[in-house]
Amino acid sequence: MKIRILRDTETVRYAAEELKKYLYMMDSDIEAEICCEGDGEITLGLLSDLKLDNSDVKDAMVDDVVDVKIDSLSGYIAGSNERSILFGVYKYLKSAGCRWVRPGDEGEYIPKKDMSRHSFAYRKKADYPFRGQAIEGAVSFEHVRDTILWLPKVDMNLFQIEQIVPYNYMSRWYLHTANTKLPHDDIPYEDYVRYAAELELIVKKCGLQLHGLGHAALNEAFGIRYKAPYMTYDIPEDAKDALALVQGERKLFNGHPMQTHLCMSQKWVRDRVVNWLIDYMKEKPYIDFMHFWLADAINNQCECEDCKKKTPSDWYVEMLNEIDARLTEEKIDSKIIFIMYVDTLWPPIIEKLNNPSRFIMTTACGSGKGYSDKRREGGIPKWERNNYSIVGGLDMALTFIDGWKPIFDGPRFVYEYMFYTGHYADPGYMTFARKVAKDMKELRVTGFDGIMSDQTQRCYFPTGLPVSVFGEFLFDTSLDTEEYIDKYMQDSFGEGWREAKEYLEKISASFDPEAMKQNTDVTAQDTGCVDVNSKKAGIIGNEALGDIIATVPDTVDKFAPVIEKYITLSDKCHRESWRILKYHGIYCKGISDVYYALSRGDQKGALDIFWKFADKLSEIEMEIHPYFDLCLFHQRTKQVIAGK
């Protein structure tokens, strides 16, 4: 048979190659040929190429519409853009029983099937246009590569590679910073540069939205390249006058480039930043969305007399307009993502965006608390320079967004952290997965157009269920949660899936994920502004919860024979799922010991147990590293032990 592509581009050809590969894996009688001319049994193209309805496509850069009609290996797969054609390929394959339960080859379940008898008709516009991830945690090139290739298989359409070179995230893996057994030897910096470039190419091959920059790019124009928070940085002589004046000094705030603002009232400073950004974008015009953010941290705005003439948001918008004008001059169509965060939560008083269509808004408003359209009582508080003290949250973010609407009322998405360390609160992932499904269904009431998930690319321990739910429920909020969970577990574990599901339900229930949450979310940790009245008792001193957690080792031991029964299944995906579950039992027993000590109020004892457990995890990390981020586990667990 022939697969005809109407556009011979990298992404469309990749979609055709994926279709060819998996058709053959399902049905070895199908040896497809990819062609550009003549007739083909299956045709791949844009909606417009095939003269199909595209009336619901407002912006092909962000609107994903999939249209598939194939009857007995004859028909078409079409999309509003090239990545939507790839989505369509996977939709067709999934309709025939294929499933990608986690990244990597061992996460793909491809059944045998006579495809000549299979038919599928489907048309759907994604419910949210922004669905994806940003690099985070401790990750290797392979971890991120496999994630990017997996994203379109679960309906995600974007990936952000934060920083010029994501050294902070990738070096944690290559240095094995949290592993007490492996050597802490770095690789050459040039390798990180090469990895970043290769990852960008993979994002583009899949046709995904490529998001670039973010925090830490602000000082690049002055020769200050941020790598990691523990490093020391020299300030070039010509950069000193460009740094924000804080408490009478112009220096790196907390010694940290990512936390350092500039003196934005000085035009030469703004010009230098703008020129650097334009040069960067001329080198990489393929970046679809450039995130231009200011510094992280609080109480670090410039206090010089000229900067005090306008608010940080006014200076920010002035610079955004300057960047937009230069991009227009250079005929670069990339969108600009601006962030409503800390001081720029407050809308500008003087400045307006000259070209709102260039921009997308994002904001970080905490995670794990669900979504509603409630606003903060009392409205927008008064802004004071370097006296930031507000407690964030969704209600506060929506209140500020209302204030921004006269200036900008365009597309916006949430910068979320649910998979940063939140998944560690539920070792079974079952309660967590249902919470993610509920949140994705409720997001619409906020007016947000999707989610960028700042997360580790290694959160599939014990399953990829929550992340799969995240992607596929953002694409289609009408999915039934319980039906989805059952089908996922069946595809992941094969024979014995009901036993696996029942076991993981017990694990989730034993830990009570709601009580295991940290008292402060990531945004609160960054700003230090926490509502003490909202803190929960959690696990420390919670003897009733500790008594339940104490049953976990017995639950694990009783289930061990079931794992041994299914761990040799013939299908590689099913076999790997059961193997992961075996190592996950070691994890459940160890973390239950830590939490039991905390339930008795013994924080010192819990820390001692944690370090012994961390040694054990270090010994087995190479068996589970694609699925479990040991570095963020260290960070999260030590914070819980400390009562944070």
Stretch-by-stretch model annotation:
Residues 30-59:
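Short, well-ordered secondary-structure micro-motifs within conserved domains or adaptor modules
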Residues 197, 258-261, 265-405, 416:
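Gly/Pro-rich turn-and-neighbor structural signature
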Residues 226, 348-355, 429, 461-463:
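Short glycine-biased active-site loop of nucleotidyltransferases that positions the nucleotide triphosphate
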Residues 269, 279, 381-498, 502:
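Structured mid-domain segments that build the active-site/substrate or prosthetic-cofactor binding neighborhood
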Residues 447, 472-644:
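Catalytic domains of carbohydrate-active enzymes that cleave complex glycans
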